[in-house]
């Protein structure tokens, strides 16, 4: 699917579905997640940080499929571990969802994921 079609599906979405490949099973595994957009990049924060299962799966196989409002897009994820970069992603989430929500749902923001949409 074209990037512009998928981006249109993101405009009014507060949550998307990601699909990753299981590191042990090799099966496709899907999860609902919050996201933040910045230009042609989409950012994800794993709820339990680096202990989150879907994040561990991306470490082995960085291919990720995103789905929003009936539109899908498949690309490679970039894992962010630099404290400053992760902090910038946390700020994007605070701007979108509110500081209280981010604090409640993301107690261990030690990693983030960058997904190029172009």
Language-model-detected regions and their locations in the chain:
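Short, solvent-exposed coil/turn segments
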Residues: 11-13, 28, 59, 108
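Covalent nucleotidyltransferase core used to form phosphodiester bonds in nucleic acids
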Residues: 6-8, 43-56
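Generic signal for short, ordered secondary-structure residues
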Residues: 4-5, 37, 68, 72
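Short beta-strand segments
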Residues: 13-47, 64
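Short, structured beta-strand-loop surface elements
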Residues: 49-118
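Extreme N-terminal tail/first-helix region
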Residues: 1-17, 84
């Amino acid at each position: 699917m074209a990037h512009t079609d998928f981006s249109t599906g993101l405009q009014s979405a507060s949550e998307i579905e990601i699909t990753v490949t299981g590191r042990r099973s090799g099966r496709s595994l899907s999860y609902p997640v919050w996201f933040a957009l910045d230009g042609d990049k989409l950012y994800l924060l794993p709820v339990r940080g680096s202990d989150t299962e879907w994040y561990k799966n991306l470490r082995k196989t960085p291919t990720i499929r995103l789905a929003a409002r009936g539109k899908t897009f498949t690309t490679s994820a970039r894992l962010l571990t630099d404290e400053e970069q992760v902090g910038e992603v946390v700020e994007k989430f605070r701007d979108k969802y509110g500081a209280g929500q981010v604090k409640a749902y993301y107690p261990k923001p030690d990693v983030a994921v960058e997904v190029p949409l172009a």
